[in-house]
């Protein structure tokens, strides 16, 4: 099982979401505890990170397998996620 760490920029992103998107993203984040590389997640090109779709939003995170931690660093709308 992985420990989930929500970094301050991701917490700010999460705080701005409407209730429905918030609930969907929290479900996805909780699922990362069991599987840090779930089906549908992708390794980011040119970065040390992964992305996971949650409706119109993307959860951007890094995996530390040595310490069994997932660092969530951003939660962005898909149009803003990669800029």
Predicted segments with their positions:
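A short, surface-exposed loop/turn module that caps and links secondary-structure elements
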Residues: 28-53
């Amino acid at each position: 099982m992985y420990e989930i760490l929500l970094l301050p920029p991701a917490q700010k992103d999460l705080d701005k979401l409407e209730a429905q998107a918030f609930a969907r993203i929290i479900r996805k984040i909780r699922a990362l505890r069991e599987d840090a590389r779930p089906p549908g997640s992708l390794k980011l090109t040119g970065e040390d990170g992964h992305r996971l779709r949650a409706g119109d939003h993307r959860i951007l995170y890094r995996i530390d397998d040595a310490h069994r931690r997932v660092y969530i660093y951003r939660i962005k709308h898909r149009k803003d996620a990669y800029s």
